[in-house]
Amino acid sequence: MTGAIIHEEAFEEISEDISSLLPEKINHYIEPICGSMETFINLNLKKQLPFPVLSDPDNSLISLYKYVKGMPEEFYHAPENSHRGRTKGALLALRKRYREIMNHGTMEEAAIYLQINILNAMRSKNSGIFGILKDTTSDNKILEFPTETEIVEFSSW
């Protein structure tokens, strides 16, 4: 098992460790801190977990997953186009609006939460649909909001 500070490379190892401790047949699965859901997704691919209960102390994260799962097309169109830029001003405007509406569980809050995390990810090494640094044809990484197709595909998990 890895240490308390988890790097993205360790998620697969953690999933393997957890998977080896689980029985072959699982009736219920509870994930107390789902975070990026990397561990749950990897486990689900291996075990086909029935009736998963996903939780996290971050209410905005739970709202985000709720809207992606239940209304992926509407969620994709929720952000205001003016806030889709990658400028410092756009990020500051998003943060200000988020502070005004946080903990209300609205689709707008969830969309802004995702956008803020995408913009903040510019400084990290995250990859994948909600880590959002995508590979281009030339080894460059670019930051993009997930496409509507990606959000709909992710919602089918």
Regions found by a protein language model. Give the residues of each.
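SAM-dependent nucleic-acid methyltransferase catalytic core
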Residues: 1-15, 24, 71-157
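Conserved S-adenosyl-L-methionine
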Residues: 11-14, 21-84
